[in-house]
Amino acid sequence: MAFVIRLGLCWFALLALAGCQTNDFNAESYAELDQRYDVVIRRDVRGVPHVLGATDPDTAFGFAYAQAEDNWQLIEDAMPFYRGNSAVYSGMDGAVTDYLVKWLGLWETVHENYKWDLSPDTRAYVEAYADGLNFYAATHPDKVDESKLPVTAKDVVVGHMLRHLLFYGFDGVVREVNKAERQRDISTPSEAMAVPADAKEITLGGLPIGSNAFAIAPHFSEEGATRLAINSHQPTTGPVAWYEAHIQSKTGLNVMGGLFPGSPSISVGFTENIAWGATVNRPDLVDVYVLEVNPDNEYQYRLDGEWRDLERDEVDIKLTLWGFLPWTVSREVLASEHGPVLRTEHGTYAIRYAGMGELRQVEQWYRMNRATNFSEWREAMAMKSFASFNFAYADKEGNIMFLHNSLTPRRDPRYGWSQYLPGDDSSLIWKETLGFSQLPQVVNPASGYVHSANQTPFNVTAEADNPKLENYKPGHGFQMDMTNRAQ
């Protein structure tokens, strides 16, 4: 793909790159943000923060401040990644992810829909969380890089959007398409498949890794209590290492558990009444379409017998070369009716993926944190803003549940969706996903247990209580492999 490199306007100040960075961070005004919030942070003997606010936004403000005290560098370093300007700080190493953020149009989605897709109480909560980070930065100037400030609520929202994509392996599909040769055949209706062909174990250094969560019903436990074990396997340091906290407000929020630094809500944990754990799953949630390009116009593709125009735009990737030289790389971004488009030496491809245009992840986590019973927790999960993850649930009323959470597309069962798809048929551009009640799940099984260890959702409890694969048409792309921990 052709691109243009332009020397930055600050080329004459090669030794003063900071002069090229502009920001709207007024430390003096941000240092007064604490006057708006009523919150107390206490730490237990292990240093775990217990945050008590008068309202949920008060709690969010204090929660952010506590996280910043413990993990400021991780939070700050993530901001350029979410904004698509990490190459300014890391050079060419960050250019690829910067292009990914811009190619996906994440910020356009947030700018257009932030006010409409997120409820007022969620916006107030996330904005208070951003205030807490900025208050910490303003009162600790020796620890922060002001060129990355201020943090906004939209930064937090985009961060969730991007991380959810990476958790189910979207980036792996993009890397595959960009390889030197085409990796898969184009599917035809005769290649319909009952199960996906390429489910893969999650590995590190060749060894299987992953997480575990299991719930035990009262009638299956010796003491007659509901039990939930959360055994999520994450690194001990870094941006996806668990951070433990307890957050509480006087308006109903009261939850403790683990999260990744920079998250405004608890990801796995418990309240006074309910608890849940999560494990990574790998359903097939990304489809690749091979486009037929007009030989007389490279910006047109065939769809339903007609030539359609590709959407075209140009984005600037700002870099710093050799640690001091600012450059700007201009790159073309294309999109078809299917989704974002990539040109390669072996073809032009459109990518369609679960979660396109979805920004409500922060709201769903918040609703889960506020849930007080099984019904409210399921209502939160029925938002279906998460593209993936398995969940194991338990509560003090004795309910247990396994949920294979995924934005599973409703695909044409005549095609093998683990292959590439012909891009000239609009009927293959799926627009709907399975409803919440249609996802593989187990509620209060007679067996008395459910477990999740990154395995297929069709083997999570006793055989008689498992979801049945035969209830689903081919093409949904459910994960079919077992893991060594699930057997």
PLM ranges: what are they?
Residues 119, 132, 199, 209-215, ...:
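Short alpha-helical segments and helix-capping/turn motifs at coil-helix boundaries
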Residues 24-239, 250-252, 256-265, 336, ...:
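Substrate-recognition/specificity elements adjacent to catalytic centers across diverse enzyme folds
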Residues 49-52, 227-229, 266-269, 275-278, ...:
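Structural recognition of the beta-strand scaffold that forms the well-ordered cores
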